[in-house]
Amino acid sequence: MKKAIKIIASIIIIVLVLLFGAEWWLEGKIKKTASEQIYEKTGGRIIADVGRVNISLIGRKVNIEEVTFRTDTTRPVMPGIPFEYADGLIRTITVKGIHYHKKDSAISVSARQFELDIPQATLISAKDAEDKRPEKTDTLGQQMKLAIGNFDLHLGDIFWKQHQHQDTVSYFVQELKWHMDDWKIDTAPDSIHPPCLCEDIRISLNGFQNQFARNSQLLEIDSLSINGKERMISVGRIALIPRYPMEEFALKSPGHTDWTKITAGKITLYGWDMQRLLKEQFLQIDSVDLQQADIASFKNRKIEQRKKVKRLFYQSVQQLPLHFAVRRVNLNHIDVKYLELSENGERPGTITFNRLNGMFYDLTNVSRPHQAYYTLKAEGKLMDRGVMRASFRLPIAPRNDLFEVEGHLGAMSITDLNPMIEPLVKIRVVSGELDDLKFRIKGDSIQSKVDMVFLYWDLKVRLLKEKDGEIKVRSFLTTLANGLIFTENNPNHRGERQVEATAERDVYRSQFNYLWRSLLAGLKKSIGL
């Protein structure tokens, strides 16, 4: 009996020694191989030091700690490497409960837990690194299943600069935490979008910055929170900040011709269906709430710009790569300012829309038999004076190119429009009161028709010219216009004037310009032009 016990004990000791020896050998092998491979692949430019490696064969666990990266800038950048500069720390990589199985061409990998913690990293991509899809090979015929019980990713301060042709763009992420429960990916042969499933997802972010090419604009996000089970997404302040003055922007950033500044308050998405997004690649949201936004845009026509066809709003929605449906989008307190400097102008024309509130109803890019349009209803003030209301019916399906806009503008002095009219068309409104303006626009992406009733009285103008940097009045033409061309009042002795007019869309101009052209066609007819 004692002999049997000794034999068993000896076997156990031998097994443990072999087991611990194998673990010790694997730990050293991983530590050495990782450093050598990175050094060799980068020609000694990127140097990695692995602090500790712990392996438990019985527990099916791998833990790697304190991996540091640094760059020897005296070494040349080898062609084909992804990064020309890397500096940072991987605090820990932990994988527990690892299982690997292969049968024929099917591979299955699973883990009970995966954790990656990178508190700090600075990465600069190599200039010749290209983001290309891998060529189709026989490996695409394999089926691979990946399953992770608990997935945890933590990124501290991460800076990444990417080369883009002869320019660079950069990204900065601050305190990203990403957690998923029961994450699964199952790829079928030749699958383009393999199904990705998880029971829950929680993401939090304390800050994000994206520096655009040519240092033209900076995108900032203060915070982000995504919760799958609570079906809510929350975004803190968002800002798009131009990096050059308005007058110089088009010259210094030809890829971004319009100076645009946007700041938005809190954006909250309620009732998003995480499971439908993962299974069907369809984003379904119950409601979106936007609290406060300021939008300013400036177009400088004195600087020659490359012409680019611009899509209308509904065309952009139709062409989004992801199908989506949002029951309601609530817009609260939005201020919009648009400035335009004409080719021969010295100061820009300005128009403002103040304290806008609106609601999108059934916003989607997936047409259904009972829904061909979605609707936007909005109200606010024009030039912080006249109360305006508008309703937009916009098409869902790409084959439907018809839209409708119906609106109303309340009483205001027409002279309040001089900041827009005078610099752009060289006309100054001396007097004139708007009583009521009603319009209906029907059109497509080529042409629109407007029906308008523009009620006003005591309209008088001065026609201007600019000479030697000074604005002067065209006296004779002003007298002619007020006496013979312009209709001073509507209604007048002939009664109320209702007009119809058409407008052609300039495909190189914005949606706002198209609406303005449509309204201007009706306004001209209303005053007798």
How would you label these PLM feature ranges?
Residues 18-123, 141-142, 148, 163-265, ...:
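Terminal hydrophobic membrane-targeting helix
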Residues 95-98, 102, 107-231, 310-403:
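Elongated, acidic membrane-bridging lipid-handling scaffolds
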Residues 109-114, 203, 280-301, 315-324, ...:
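Glycine-rich, small/hydroxylated-residue low-complexity segments
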Residues 123-126, 245, 297-299, 461-463:
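Outer-membrane beta-barrel proteins
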Residues 128-134, 303-309, 424-425, 467-473:
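Flexible, surface-exposed loop regions and adjacent strand-edge segments
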